[in-house]
Amino acid sequence: MALGQRLFITMSRGAGRVQGTLQALVFLGVLVGMVVPSPAGARANGTLLDSRGWGTLLSRSRAGLAGEISGVNWESGYLVGIKRQRRLYCNVGIGFHLQVPPDGRISGTHEENPYSLLEISTVERGVVSLFGVKSALFIAMNSKGRLYTTPSFHDECKFRETLLPNNYNAYESDLYRGTYIALSKYGRVKRGSKVSPIMTVTHFLPRI
């Protein structure tokens, strides 16, 4: 009898343990069933969000790149696109304006006239071209420092425009450094290799 009671108690305890284990497994299964879909959804959503995030980032990157390119184009356009119509006044002798007549003989004129109106265009940073508006000729300088005119633009038409302490400008050949545009006290063109920016003959004041 006692043995039967002990066996019953042992079986009851074993059943209780099994039942407890089964209940725990069922509870765990329910919990997993509730939890597992969420990470999947979260992963799906996360992937979608990540995709959207990458898409947004890519869009912003493209926009930023476009902005940078636009900025570069704007800067380049700003630097290269500046065109000023001015007369270059040299305060030597009685004072002369640089002129480009239709015969191409560059000289200085005391009085303003249509041939003394020049279009100063920026072609590079700090580098300009000088174009006679009326004569449609570019001012150029050869390797000997002599000025001449040409209807077409090329490297000898490039001049470095430098602002001097007296607020005048000096125009140095970009191709042949150390040669400058200059006018004598008689209004004649001087050879660019014989002058320097410390000489007044190379100083020009842009006037409207």
From Swiss-Prot:
It comes from the Eukaryota. Embryos, adult muscles and adult testis. Residues 1-37 form the signal peptide. One of its GO terms (cellular component) is extracellular region. GO terms for molecular function: growth factor activity. CDD domains: beta-trefoil_FGF6 (cd23318). Pfam families: FGF (PF00167). SUPFAM superfamilies: Cytokine (SSF50353). GO terms for biological process: angiogenesis; cartilage condensation; fibroblast growth factor receptor signaling pathway; myoblast differentiation; positive regulation of cell division; positive regulation of cell population proliferation. It is found in: Secreted, Extracellular space. Keywords: Angiogenesis, Developmental protein, Differentiation, Disulfide bond, Glycoprotein, Growth factor, Mitogen, Proto-oncogene, Secreted, Signal. Glycans are attached at N45. Disulfide bonds join C90-C157. InterPro entries: Fibroblast_GF_fam, IL1/FGF. Belongs to the heparin-binding growth factors family. Interacts with FGFR1, FGFR2 and FGFR4. Affinity between fibroblast growth factors (FGFs) and their receptors is increased by heparan sulfate glycosaminoglycans that function as coreceptors. Plays an important role in the regulation of cell proliferation, cell differentiation, angiogenesis and myogenesis, and is required for normal muscle regeneration. This is Fibroblast growth factor 6. It comes from Mus musculus. The lineage of its organism: Eukaryota, Metazoa, Chordata, Craniata, Vertebrata. The gene is Fgf6.
